């Protein structure tokens, strides 16, 4: 064959392209399983960190298998809800929501042209009573997301962990890298009746002598990262707003001290009455 003509050049180039494409596809497929496993373990470690079972650094040292084992040991139940706070379906306890899945649900919550269906957002309840929910939104340069854990009362924040794709190192990236920023959320009680469930603002709320916030739901914004702080604030407001009806409905009711359902969730007295008040009247 004449190697100097155009036909040879075209055939040769086509073969090279096909071979290289096949090799790239093979490598990509070979790595896909490992990438998915790493992503799942990372997501779980974020949830465990928010729920105060350890630090992100500690989970990174443990390895994927140990992280999954810890999660299996601590998780109690998982399910999805709609915006009315009603359960849609139970989730396999091994199921987690990747940032890509959170992005899709973010579109569904907000509505508009990118909506793919009705919102179906996850709730993760651990055996110690903490409830963890995700948040997702836009930072300055890319998406930001994270997890917020609540105590049994479903009002008080037990912990939080945030992550990002490409925020500025030393500035916006502090939502992930600065534990003191995440620690500010602990003990706060978001306002589920307001559009501003949390407010991340410069200066935050006034503090007492021990550095504790004197006003609930106000967090000090990161200095030099106004756009990232604002984006995270909007993400938290959007997602916790989407969970508002669930939290308000599932929060433990204030029963009398002698009620057998004291401290339990909203389904505790379903189908029966708490008659302690009537007993007290008879006495």
Locations of regions flagged by a protein language model:
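Flexible, solvent-exposed loop/hinge segments and secondary-structure transition points
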Residues: 2-260, 274-283
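Cys/His-rich microdomains that often coordinate metals
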Residues: 263
């Amino acid at each position: 064959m004449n190697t100097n003509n155009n036909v040879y050049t075209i055939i040769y180039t086509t073969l090279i392209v096909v071979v290289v494409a096949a090799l790239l596809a093979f490598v990509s497929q070979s790595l896909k399983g490992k990438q998915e496993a790493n992503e799942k373990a990372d997501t779980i470690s974020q949830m465990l960190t928010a729920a105060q079972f350890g630090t992100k650094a500690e989970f990174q040292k443990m390895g994927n298998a140990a992280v999954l084992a810890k999660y299996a040991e601590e998780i109690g139940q998982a399910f999805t809800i709609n915006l009315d706070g009603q359960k849609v379906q139970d989730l396999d306890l091994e199921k987690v929501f990747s940032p890509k899945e959170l992005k899709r649900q973010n579109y569904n919550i907000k509505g508009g042209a990118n909506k793919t269906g009705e919102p179906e957002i996850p709730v993760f309840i651990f055996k110690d009573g903490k409830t963890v929910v995700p948040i997702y939104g836009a930072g300055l340069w890319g998406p930001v997301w994270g997890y917020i854990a609540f105590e049994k009362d479903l009002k008080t924040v037990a912990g939080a962990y945030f992550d990002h794709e490409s925020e500025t190192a030393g500035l916006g990236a502090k939502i992930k890298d600065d534990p003191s920023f995440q620690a500010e959320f602990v003990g706060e009680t978001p306002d589920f009746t307001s559009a501003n469930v949390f407010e991340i603002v410069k200066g935050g709320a006034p503090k007492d002598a021990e550095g504790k916030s004197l006003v609930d739901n106000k967090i000090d914004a990161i200095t030099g990262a106004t756009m990232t702080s604002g984006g995270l604030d909007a993400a938290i407001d959007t997602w916790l707003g989407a969970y508002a009806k669930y939290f308000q409905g599932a929060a433990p009711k204030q029963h009398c001290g002698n009620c057998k359902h004291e401290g339990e969730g909203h389904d505790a007295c379903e189908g029966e009455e708490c008659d302690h008040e009537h007993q007290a009247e008879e006495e």
